[in-house]
Amino acid sequence: MRPDYRKAMLESEIMKLITEALREAKDPKISGQIITISRVELSNDKRFADVYVSAMGDKDERVKTVEYLDKIKGYFRTYLANNLDLYTAPQIRFKEDPGIEASVRIQELLNKIKEEETQ
């Protein structure tokens, strides 16, 4: 099995498991929110996993959500260790995904241009 293929499969599996862990979490701070894991990037040595998260709400709420997820990352690492077939579970680093916000902004700009053209 090629290393790139294995890394991609592990990233996909980690994304699936973290999504499951979010769904099963009993924490009231995250259970009522809509949180989406957009992608996972695993380091070459498989020791670190950067998890890109998007959450509903304004900028402050999104930042607080990502900071809180980073604060309780031990829960997610334990969940990965129990469900993933690796020697050691990777350390998780949650990061806000700017891609979704950027695509929404681009769509708003395109809609604005379209409205100006019709007038």
From Swiss-Prot:
Asked if Cytoplasm is a keyword of the record, the answer is: yes
Instruction: List keywords of the entry alphabetically.
Output: Cytoplasm, Ribosome biogenesis
Q: Which Pfam families match?
A: RBFA (PF02033)
Location of the protein in the cell = Cytoplasm
Q: Which domain of life is it from?
A: Bacteria
Subunit field text: Monomer. Binds 30S ribosomal subunits, but not 50S ribosomal subunits or 70S ribosomes.
Entry protein name: Ribosome-binding factor A
